[in-house]
């Protein structure tokens, strides 16, 4: 199931990348933009550097967005009209699959036959479009799910909304129809095989990477000064979309418990919550503020909007610990970015986080989401400078094992394997026709 690069391959001249529900041009950390946006942007740019031109198809969400934009040299983003710009909830997007597919097919029709060599779809909505494009364009389909409905529904946060059956059925169709499936970790690969009956030979395990040039250790005092934080503060951080799935409430509840046990810590403690509302979190965008107020910790909690680029790296550097308490996470790029900056991570032992975080080496993994356990884990790091230093020493070495270059090389290998599968399926169909 693990992709290798020893297979001789023909690199595709041009790849069509489908991302219906969110654009790589959007700011991660708010709305539906997150790790998937980073993944698409980084791998597309690296594919172009390696000689494969990339066209990314996404849905237009504003009249201010140009229909065609350049993300990086050799990478074009096409924003297609499919439904209204505003007021369309993510749960309503299945109604726009046909409109989006029609837009993509019209773009391809303006080119000579065989213009695209491979289709790579991201998330199940795009997978449905990729399923159709595969048939119409006669090219292999590679699909990356990023999240899976059956996995999310098996680990719902309290008060969160289950993924609908239409998504489950859509994912099952894409899994069956794709020539190659990309899983972020062996855990996700197992979910595809066991929960979705994927062919084990069709699943490639390719971990995401991290930008090791941007996310590096730096001056903590300088980073804290950027956000007006005292140099001697004890800083806990959360970075991500504000929604039940990402569980920032777990961090706030653990913070309250930590202060109950160690009231003297209040004078120095700062909890940074960096991100914007998303998904079911949009239903009550102020819910986390209300929780902080009810817990009596508004004096230590600071809310910041999503941060870009170097500012995001400064957030990680400013923290003593970054918490990733998600209920479900196919990988966890935030955890990897924080470690690349030299900051230990305390994360939930779910999904791909046991791969993203080396337990006891670069951070700690916590079983479950019980407040007491999280307070214990956080206390064991922030109240023990020696332990924090030992974990910090293991962060950059662990993060160095993940690069976008290696991710993209493995994707190219997977594209070649997908072509082999596609050709074999085509021959079988011709023989049985």
UniProtKB/Swiss-Prot annotation:
Record: residues binding 1D-myo-inositol 3-phosphate: 21, 32-37, 90, 123, 147, 167
Any Pfam family: Glyco_trans_4_4
Gene transcribed to yield this protein: mshA
An individual GO BP term: mycothiol biosynthetic process
Segment forming the signal sequence: none
Entry similarity comment: Belongs to the glycosyltransferase group 1 family. MshA subfamily.
Enzyme Commission number(s) of this protein: 2.4.1.250
MF (Gene Ontology): acetylglucosaminyltransferase activity; D-inositol-3-phosphate glycosyltransferase activity; magnesium ion binding
Physiological role: Catalyzes the transfer of a N-acetyl-glucosamine moiety to 1D-myo-inositol 3-phosphate to produce 1D-myo-inositol 2-acetamido-2-deoxy-glucopyranoside 3-phosphate in the mycothiol biosynthesis pathway.
Enzyme class: transferase
Keywords: Glycosyltransferase, Magnesium, Metal-binding, Transferase
Spans through the membrane: none
SUPFAM superfamilies, per the entry: UDP-Glycosyltransferase/glycogen phosphorylase (SSF53756)
Binding residue positions for Mg(2+): 316-317, 319, 343
Binding residues annotated for UDP-N-acetyl-alpha-D-glucosamine, in chain numbering: 27-28, 35, 241, 246, 307, 329, 337
Protein's name in the database: D-inositol 3-phosphate glycosyltransferase
Gene3D superfamilies tied to this protein: Glycogen Phosphorylase B (3.40.50.2000)
Presence of keyword Iron-sulfur: no
Catalytic activity reported: 1D-myo-inositol 3-phosphate + UDP-N-acetyl-alpha-D-glucosamine = 1D-myo-inositol 2-acetamido-2-deoxy-alpha-D-glucopyranoside 3-phosphate + UDP + H(+)
Quaternary structure and partners: Homodimer.
């Amino acid at each position: 199931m693990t992709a290798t690069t020893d297979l001789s391959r023909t690199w595709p001249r041009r790849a069509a990348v489908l991302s219906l529900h969110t654009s790589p041009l959007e700011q991660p950390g708010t709305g539906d933009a997150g790790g998937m946006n980073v993944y698409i942007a980084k791998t597309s740019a690296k594919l172009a550097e390696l000689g494969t031109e990339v066209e990314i198809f996404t849905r237009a969400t504003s009249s201010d967005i140009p229909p065609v934009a350049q993300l990086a040299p050799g990478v074009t983003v096409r924003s297609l009209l499919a439904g209204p710009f505003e007021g369309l909830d993510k749960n309503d997007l299945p109604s726009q699959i046909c409109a989006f597919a029609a837009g993509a097919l019209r773009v391809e029709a303006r080119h000579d036959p065989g213009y695209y060599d491979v289709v790579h779809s991201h998330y199940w909505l795009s997978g449905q479009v990729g399923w159709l494009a595969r048939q119409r364009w006669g090219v292999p389909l590679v699909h990356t799910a990023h999240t899976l409905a059956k996995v999310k529904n098996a680990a719902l946060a309290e008060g969160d909304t289950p993924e609908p059956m239409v998504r489950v059925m859509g994912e099952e169709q894409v899994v069956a129809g794709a020539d190659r499936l990309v899983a972020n970790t062996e855990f996700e690969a197992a979910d595809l095989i066991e929960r979705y009956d994927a062919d084990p030979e069709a699943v490639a395990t390719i971990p995401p990477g991290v930008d090791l040039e941007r996310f590096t250790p730096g001056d903590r005092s300088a980073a804290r000064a950027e956000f007006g934080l005292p140099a001697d503060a004890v800083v806990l951080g959360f970075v991500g979309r504000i929604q039940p799935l990402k569980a920032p409430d777990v961090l706030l509840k653990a913070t309250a418990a930590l202060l109950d046990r160690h009231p003297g810590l209040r004078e120095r403690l700062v909890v940074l919550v960096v991100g914007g509302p998303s998904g079911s979190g949009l239903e009550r965008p102020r819910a986390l503020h209300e929780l902080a107020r009810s817990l009596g910790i508004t004096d230590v909690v600071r809310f910041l909007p999503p941060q870009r680029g170097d500012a995001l790296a400064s957030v990680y550097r400013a923290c003593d610990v970054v918490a990733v308490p998600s209920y479900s996470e196919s990988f966890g790029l935030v955890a990897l970015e924080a470690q690349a900056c030299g900051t230990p991570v305390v994360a939930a032992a779910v999904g791909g986080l046991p791969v993203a975080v080396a337990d006891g080496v670069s951070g700690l993994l916590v079983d479950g989401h019980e407040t007491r356990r999280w307070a214990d884990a956080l206390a064991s790091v922030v109240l023990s400078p020696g332990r924090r230093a030992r974990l910090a020493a293991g962060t950059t070495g662990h993060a160095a094992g993940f690069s976008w270059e290696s991710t993209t090389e493995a994707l190219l290998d997977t594209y070649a394997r997908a072509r082999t599968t596609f050709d074999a399926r085509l021959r079988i169909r011709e023989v049985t026709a």
